[in-house]
Amino acid sequence: MFDKQEFVSKLVTEEKAKIVLLVMDGLGDIPVNGKTPLQAANTPNLDNLAKESDLGQTIPVLPGITPGSGPGHLSLFGYDPIKYQIGRGILEALGIGVEVGEKDVVARANFATWDGKVVLDRRAGRPATEESAKVVQLLSEKIKKIEDVEITFYPGKEHRFVVKFTGEGLGDKVTDADPQKEGHPMAWAEGLDEPSKKTARIVNELIKKIAEVLKDNSKINFALIRGFSKYPDLPKFPQVYKMKAGAIATYPMYRGLAKLVGMEIIETGQTVADEIKTLKEKWNDYDFFYVHVKKTDSYGEDGKFEEKVKVIEEVDAIIPEIVSLNPDVLVITGDHSTPVPLKAHSWHPVPLLIWSKYTRRGLSQAFNEFECARGTLGTIHASDVMTLALAYAGRLEKFGA
């Protein structure tokens, strides 16, 4: 079978160049009262950049398929998200420094609110990270083993945490123990093969034990567990693209994804301004920078239009600082769309901007979904973004005579 990434890798040259991939998570949207958040936001810097850039839109997986953040990012990094299907658990686990061995299955978990019949809130009101950490500590003290499987809990950000299952004969082909929507009955884990049936049984028993431990907490009284995974084997980004790559991200899952493909994790603060400060400080240390902004996605999922607008404006304000570093290529896009009216990821194409000195500038006047839809790049697969970035950086040889 044709491997596009392997094909591109053979054309990559040793030339030096600086590439920045700025991912605004869940960026794409649909109009509310005639405008998307990108259209409603005051973005003079992004709009000026658009006038000097090639614009287009990406399909992360296939037309009509709604991607998770994992497939969306893998695709942007140049990997086939269908060939490399990775559970979210391993990404979250690696992002917070969890060691994952051969006997381990890891999963991502959310604290939730449950009334005994339906899941009322899949994120338990988004508790503060410190509050969640205390609950994780309580669970660690109360639940250590189920059958012959050791259970280890690790706190994450806000409502998120990681569970590691360690034991013999565990599989990771397990359906999510999560109804995915609020107001729905619980969807319990199911194993799709014999080893995974054991994992599913342990998972469902664990959730019941968690509910028992937390029964007196009106808000944080349940858990949803999903993204079961063992440690996968992927081609490493630095070897494929011949670049030293650094990742600047505040959320564990995205650090985990970057680590999984071989990027170095650069420590940073919690704000967009912190991330750009880190980018400037580490500018001479890497050839490729992946910079991740989470809140565009969070506010899309919460249905908060104005808040999503404000995050876009916050990013717009730091664009001159990135441009002042004079990267050879600046790519601005999202990993998927998260429309405010849907309060969820969607299948809609994702806005894409590529800025370099080699663009066919002059067509576009602003950066938004509709300008991108008519842009010079057209509609492309997200896994082609890295190929384009390398081309705009002068890092690809000619193919053929």
Swiss-Prot record:
A GO BP term here is: glycolytic process
**Which parts form a coiled-coil structure per UniProt?**
none
Among InterPro entries, the record links this protein to: Alkaline_phosphatase_core_sf, ApgAM_prokaryotes, Metalloenzyme, Pglycerate_mutase_ApgM
The main enzyme category here is isomerase
Q: EC annotation? A: 5.4.2.12
Gene3D superfamilies assigned: Alkaline Phosphatase, subunit A
Please provide, alphabetically and separated by semicolons, the GO molecular function terms listed in this UniProt record: metal ion binding; phosphoglycerate mutase activity
- Which Pfam families would you find in this protein's record? Metalloenzyme (PF01676), PhosphMutase (PF10143)
Annotated keywords: Glycolysis, Isomerase
Q: Which domain of life is it from?
A: Bacteria
Name the chemical reaction catalysed here: (2R)-2-phosphoglycerate = (2R)-3-phosphoglycerate
Question: Which pathway does it serve?
Answer: Carbohydrate degradation; glycolysis; pyruvate from D-glyceraldehyde 3-phosphate: step 3/5
Annotated family? Belongs to the BPG-independent phosphoglycerate mutase family. A-PGAM subfamily.
Q: Record's NCBIfam families? A: apgM (TIGR00306), PRK04135.1 (NF003160)
Record's function text:
Catalyzes the interconversion of 2-phosphoglycerate and 3-phosphoglycerate.
Q: What is this protein called?
A: Probable 2,3-bisphosphoglycerate-independent phosphoglycerate mutase
- The species this protein belongs to is Thermotoga sp. (strain RQ2)
